[in-house]
Design a protein with these regions (language model features):
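Phosphate-binding glycine-rich loops of NTP-binding sites
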Residues: 30
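Non-catalytic, alpha-helical, charged scaffold/linker segments
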Residues: 84-196
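Charged catalytic cores and adjacent phosphate/nucleic-acid-binding surfaces used
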Residues: 2-27, 35-97, 103, 166-185, ...
């Protein structure tokens, strides 16, 4: 799936579809967060129709799971044309959900603006001291203009801050380069270190060191669930969210995003879902690049045991999970996994008629550093020249250890 300029991407829906067409992509899921504007949907579907691309609408929601959030991608299905999608968005229950989603985005925006205030009050001085540049007071109004119609996020805040600091860094770097020309051998080493230090001030560093939620614990986080003043949609549990989504559109695909989850988490969520989770996003390229995909093999083995209706293998997997310290030493979770062992036939029954599907996401955004672009390709379907390029040893090459 990919993102357009209304969320985390760079391109508006029309240019996104045109780009997909040029790259040979014929099926595309465009993802939005918590809600989607009907005007955006109209542009997306009309552009896809003109370019001959099959497009699907995906909306990402969060649900409370223990002391954190898990994410689901809701993909309503069964639309015949643009009008049918727009009619669906006008239905009372869908409209109510979209309105609640807007409230979530408004709340999240305020948290980001609070982070900007903290940056001005505290972090700017730290950067000025460490990098030797005069950090200006950053304007919330300028930041909102920078974001435009896109989503107000900490990632975009990182890029905005970087855009304001970059001219200062470049000016300082030019001064250092001039000093290097006439510096003594002893001073050259110090000046080169100074130059290298200036190169380190990237949007990624700004996010990791000063802007991510863990660096500003006084501000409510979208990463951790809490019973505070956040909108009700951010307080709903897994069962409540899935029930609501399936009630609104029974012919829906609900994909569990597994990037930050263990196989034990996935099993527990499948149990809570009672068959309403139709797919697992086994691999997300953005999450992989960030080093968050740590249990891919184990999750895939769990999925295969369920889809093959292999009760013996599923029992072995659950027993192994049960022996882990984080489960064995937690009375509540230990009891839950005992319940799983007693209900293996029921777990298998969730996917007796329709297997638990797999999804692979490029999650293309082009934001905060280098990421893979949109889409995947099967090597055997490519021209021989392209296959030879793939076969060459490269740091970019890797195999996906999946069975589907």
């Amino acid at each position: 799936h990919v993102h357009d300029a209304n969320t985390m991407g760079r391109k508006n829906p029309t240019y996104l579809v045109m780009d997909a067409r040029v790259k040979g992509i014929r099926r595309l899921t465009v993802v939005y967060y918590n809600f989607v504007d009907p005007k955006v949907v109209y542009e997306l579907y009309e552009a896809a129709h003109i370019m001959g691309i099959s497009v699907r609408l995906g909306i990402k929601f969060k649900a409370c799971f223990h002391d954190r959030y898990v994410e689901f991608l809701w993909t309503p299905k069964g639309f015949t044309d643009t009008k049918s999608v727009l009619d669906f968005l006008k239905e009372p229950e869908t409209g109510a959900l979209m309105q609640e989603g807007r409230s979530v985005e408004d709340w999240a925006k305020e948290e980001v603006l609070q982070t900007l205030e903290v940056f001005n009050a505290k972090h700017a001085a730290e950067i000025a001291k460490e990098w030797g540049i005069e950090v200006p007071l950053l304007s919330a109004k300028e930041f909102e203009e920078y974001v435009g119609m896109g989503q107000t996020t900490l990632i975009r805040l990182s890029e905005f801050v970087h855009s304001k600091l970059l001219p200062l860094v470049e000016t300082e770097a030019d001064k250092v380069k001039q000093e290097l020309l006439s510096a003594s051998p002893e001073d050259q080493g110090v000046l080169q270190e100074r130059l290298n230090k200036l190169d380190e001030l990237t949007s990624v560093v700004l996010y990791q060191r000063w802007l991510r939620p863990s660096r500003n614990p006084e501000i409510p986080s979208l990463s951790e669930s809490a019973d505070d003043n956040r909108p009700d949609l951010l307080k709903v549990d897994v069962q409540g969210l899935l029930s609501r989504l399936m009630h609104i559109r029974p012919s829906s695909r609900i994909t569990l995003l597994t990037g930050k989850l263990s196989d034990a988490d996935v099993l527990e969520l499948l149990w809570l879902g009672q068959g309403r989770i139709s797919h697992l996003e086994i691999l997300n390229m953005k999450e992989r690049e960030l080093g968050r995909v740590k249990h891919l093999n184990e999750i895939n083995q769990l999925q295969q045991a369920i889809n093959r209706h292999n009760a013996i293998e599923l029992k072995r997997i659950i027993q192994e999970m049960h022996q882990r310290l984080e489960i064995a030493q937690n009375p509540e979770r230990s009891a839950l996994f005992n319940e799983f062992l007693e209900n293996i036939p029921r777990i298998l029954s969730f996917y007796a008629n329709q297997p638990l599907g797999s999804r692979f996401g490029s999650d293309s955004t082009t934001i905060l550093g280098t990421r893979f672009g949109m889409g995947f390709a099967v090597p055997d379907t490519l021209p021989r020249s392209a296959q030879k390029m793939i076969e060459k040893e490269s740091d970019e090459s890797f195999q996906i250890p999946l069975h589907v």
